[in-house]
């Protein structure tokens, strides 16, 4: 089980690594479940999960996988038309896309970009809300506006530019989680070892 944010990226950018794992472990049956809600692994809905928050369950084994750093991004098309913001106050002149309601937020403070540089609890009004990070990415790529996105998701993009790179947003921890009852299970150990051996590639 993994959030749509992580799952979509794994299927698109990390497909060669998934194929490598399947080639090295042909006996392991893989089923990917994209779910933004944290399901109860003890019910055996899945063997492992990638959670965007540290799990509270005492019967889980967990290890931090990666820090997801958020920044504001815009497409070349958008920035050529509206200009590159130089200061946080310049953001008031720009169009924003934000994370909408209806799904768990993948960050603790999804409205931080709307509030950046604002005072007295005020925030900018987005022109569009999307309840998935991949939806935000597609909207940014299309030139709709600026949005807060995880750095690793756009690290290889040639169409998207980081705006105000010194203004770093919240950091979200991704955790690799599985029940203690599966601690010595070969398929769990195989995927855990493979995933952590590739985490350096995932960060780049």
Q: Which residue stretches match the model-derived regions?
A:
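Heptad-repeat coiled-coil signal-transmission/dimerization helices
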Residues: 14-18
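C-terminal regulatory
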Residues: 43, 55-171, 200-204
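Short loop/edge segments at beta-strand edges and connector loops
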Residues: 32-36, 164
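Single conserved hydrophobic/aromatic residue that forms the stacking wall/gate
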Residues: 1-7, 11-12
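Pocket-flanking alpha-helical
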Residues: 40, 44-53
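Residues at or immediately flanking beta-strands
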Residues: 2, 25-31, 173-175
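A late-sequence structural motif
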Residues: 164-204
């Amino acid at each position: 089980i993994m959030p749509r944010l992580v799952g979509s990226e794994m299927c698109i950018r990390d497909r060669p690594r998934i194929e490598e794992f399947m080639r090295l472990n042909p006996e392991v049956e893989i089923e990917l479940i994209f779910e933004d809600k944290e399901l109860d692994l003890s019910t055996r809905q899945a063997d492992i999960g990638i959670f965007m928050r540290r799990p509270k369950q005492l019967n889980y084994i967990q290890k931090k996988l990666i820090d997801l750093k958020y920044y504001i991004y815009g497409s070349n098309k958008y920035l050529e038309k509206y200009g590159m913001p130089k200061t946080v106050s310049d953001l008031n002149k720009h169009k924003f896309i934000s994370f909408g309601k209806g799904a768990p937020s993948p960050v603790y403070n999804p409205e931080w970009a709307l509030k950046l540089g604002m005072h007295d609890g005020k925030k900018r009004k987005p022109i569009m809300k999307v309840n998935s990070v991949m939806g935000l990415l597609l909207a940014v790529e299309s030139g709709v506006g600026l949005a807060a996105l995880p750095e690793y998701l756009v690290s290889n993009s040639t169409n998207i530019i980081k705006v105000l790179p010194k203004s770093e947003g919240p950091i979200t921890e991704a955790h690799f989680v599985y029940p203690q009852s599966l601690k010595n299970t070969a398929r769990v150990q195989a995927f855990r070892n493979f995933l952590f051996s590739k985490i350096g590639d995932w960060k780049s």
